[in-house]
C-alpha cells in the first residue's frame, strides 16, 4: 500500500519511451525515480502521430480529432520520475503535457498525462500519420547526445 501512495501520476507513452524503444531506459533507471507498467492502451481521442526532423523523433501533434487513436503504454510514476520525464521532453518549453483519456486493453478508461507538441509547421501534418511508433533501420531515432541541431530548430527539416 505504501508504494501506491508514493506514485504521483499515470503517464501514457507512445514513442521512444515504450518497451523495446531507445529511451525506455529512462523508465527503468532507479535514479530517475519509480515507474510501474500498468498495461497497453490507446488514446480515446484521435491525434496525428508523426516522425519528424533529421533525428526521426516521434511527435504527437496537438490537433485533437485528427489522425488516429494512438497506441502506447501506461505507467504509474512517482514525482521524481515525472520530473525526469519533463526534462527529457523539455516540458514546458518544447513539449506540453496534458491529461487525456486512455482506453486500456481491458476496456477500462483512465486519465493519463501525455506529452504533445503545440507549435509545429503545418507541413508536419502532411507526414505519414502513425497509429503506433517503432524505431526502424529506415528511420532510426537519434538520441539527444548525438544531435548537432536542437530538435526544436529542426522541425522544418
Curated annotation (Swiss-Prot):
Query: What are the annotated GO cellular component locations?
Result: cytosol
Source organism superkingdom = Eukaryota
* Keywords from the UniProt entry: Acyltransferase, Transferase
Enzyme class per UniProt = transferase
Which SUPFAM superfamilies does the entry link to? Answer: Gamma-glutamyl cyclotransferase-like (SSF110857)
Which terms in the Gene Ontology molecular function aspect does this entry carry? acyltransferase activity; gamma-glutamylaminecyclotransferase activity
Q: Name one Pfam family in it.
A: GGACT
Where is the catalytic site?
89
Residues reported in the UniProt entry to bind substrate: 14-17
Return the similarity comment: Belongs to the gamma-glutamylcyclotransferase family.
Question: What is the name listed in the Swiss-Prot or TrEMBL entry for this protein?
Answer: Putative gamma-glutamylcyclotransferase CG2811
Query: Which species is this record about?
Result: Drosophila melanogaster
